[in-house]
């Protein structure tokens, strides 16, 4: 996992995309228990996103309002495809700050870059915007999550050397999968000297229950 101002981040993150619910509402009390246990085990990295329904608000209640700000690291994401205009895209950042109450983001990602959408991040001038927020101290580490092949990854990292880290889908089942390109993307990020965070390490839970045959 990345390094925050010289402090090694323990190598396990808490993904906040799918949180427990009571009916149709996130069970914040259960999330509090989960967050507390995660911190007690020595881990610190929490990962949410603007487009995860209710997640940013839940993590404010379960984590930010209950623990010292320097006891955890928080990542969230901006998704250009959920923004019809540049103004709307920038508003996502402000809204994420308000929802989480975090004051700043230890990690901030442009969300889910792939072949059919990466140009929209350029069109909406979002690379410039997130650089500005980092200069203001509202972002500590800047990155993007990625869902494509090594050619596009190489292009993006060449054009945006300011990136501190990249989030990749990596697991042993997809290491040589041409549709995921775990190995090739990992090697490309390393070639550029970028730190890597991993998503889908157990492939959506499938690797926790592999088929018997």
Tell me what each language-model feature is.
Residues 1-72, 129, 135:
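N-terminal binding-site loop/beta-alpha segment at the start of enzyme catalytic domains
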Residues 97-118:
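Active-site groove signature of glycoside hydrolases
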């Amino acid at each position: 996992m990345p390094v925050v101002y010289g402090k090694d981040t323990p190598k396990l993150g808490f993904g906040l995309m799918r949180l427990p619910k009571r009916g149709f509402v996130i069970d914040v009390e259960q999330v509090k228990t989960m967050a507390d246990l995660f911190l007690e085990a020595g881990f610190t990295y929490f990962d949410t996103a603007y487009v995860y329904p209710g997640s940013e608000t839940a993590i404010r209640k379960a984590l930010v309002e209950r623990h010292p700000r320097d006891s955890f690291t928080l990542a969230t994401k901006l998704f250009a495809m959920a923004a019809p205009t540049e103004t709307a895209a920038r508003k996502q950042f402000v809204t994420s700050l308000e929802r989480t109450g975090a004051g700043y983001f230890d990690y901030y990602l442009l969300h889910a870059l792939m072949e059919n959408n990466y140009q929209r991040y350029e069109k909406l001038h979002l690379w410039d915007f997130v650089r500005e927020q980092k200069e203001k101290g509202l972002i500590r580490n800047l990155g993007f999550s990625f869902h494509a092949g090594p050619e596009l990854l190489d292009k993006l990292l060449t054009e945006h050397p300011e990136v501190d880290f990249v989030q990749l889908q990596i697991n042993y089942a997809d290491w040589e999968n041409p549709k995921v390109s775990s190995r090739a993307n990992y090697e490309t990020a390393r070639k550029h000297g970028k730190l890597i965070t991993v998503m889908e390490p157990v492939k959506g839970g499938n690797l926790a229950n592999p088929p018997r045959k």
